[in-house]
Amino acid sequence: MVIKPSNWPSNIEYVNVQSFLGFKNIKKDCITGVRIKKIDDPNSIVYGQYGLFATQKFDKYDIIGQYTGKVVSEFSAGIYVASCKNCCIDAECEGNELRFINDNKNISDEPNTTIRVTYVDKKPRVMFVVTKDIEEGEQILTSYGKSYWE
């Protein structure tokens, strides 16, 4: 049985590895040090949506975790997408806690994480890496890139 966060949305399958051609190698734990939280600040651009928040301090260069979802072509990519070299990882219908990382635009002057692609056994893995210290309780943010907003 896969252990998922207690407040995980019921309409999204929780996975913490990529789904590729129907095969999954599912680990049975959640990403540590983070919590999904509904944004309750009415002044926030993402009010009423979800965000990912630190439950511990993260230092610059820490790896928060691997972004997971279904491997798809760039052509079929949706809105919850991280890009690799020739493919994308779409977490719209399945993924892990990292799918709730919001863009820093209109929230913070700069993101506190970035996406980095690394290779394990010649397979790409999309990782979220801390770019500046994140304090406990702080929202985890990244830049979706200019093309997302065009």
List PLM regions with ranges.
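Catalytic cores of histone-lysine modification enzymes
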Residues: K4, W8-N112
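C-terminal SET catalytic tail plus cysteine-rich post-SET Zn-binding segment of SAM-dependent SET-domain
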Residues: V2-S10, K105-E150
